[in-house]
């Protein structure tokens, strides 16, 4: 999801993404070279 400023409602310029498999992650990291920004990968599963 995209993170928004609480006061203005505008995007803060970053977000969080969850991948169900490595194929989706591979697609994003490949396209990162085309200017989608920085990608960080954490392979630990988190439960909320």
From Swiss-Prot:
Gene3D superfamilies: 3.30.70.330. InterPro entries: Nucleotide-bd_a/b_plait_sf (IPR012677), RBD_domain_sf (IPR035979), RNA-binding_reg (IPR050886), RRM_dom (IPR000504). GO terms for molecular function: RNA binding. Keywords: RNA-binding. GO terms for biological process: miRNA transport. This is Glycine-rich RNA-binding protein 2. It comes from Populus euphratica (Euphrates poplar). The lineage of its organism: Eukaryota, Viridiplantae, Streptophyta, Embryophyta, Tracheophyta.
């Amino acid at each position: 999801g995209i993170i928004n400023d609480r006061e203005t409602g505008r995007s803060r310029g970053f977000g969080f993404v969850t991948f169900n498999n490595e194929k989706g992650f591979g697609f994003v990291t490949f396209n990162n070279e085309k200017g989608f920004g920085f990608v960080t990968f954490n392979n630990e599963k988190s439960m909320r």
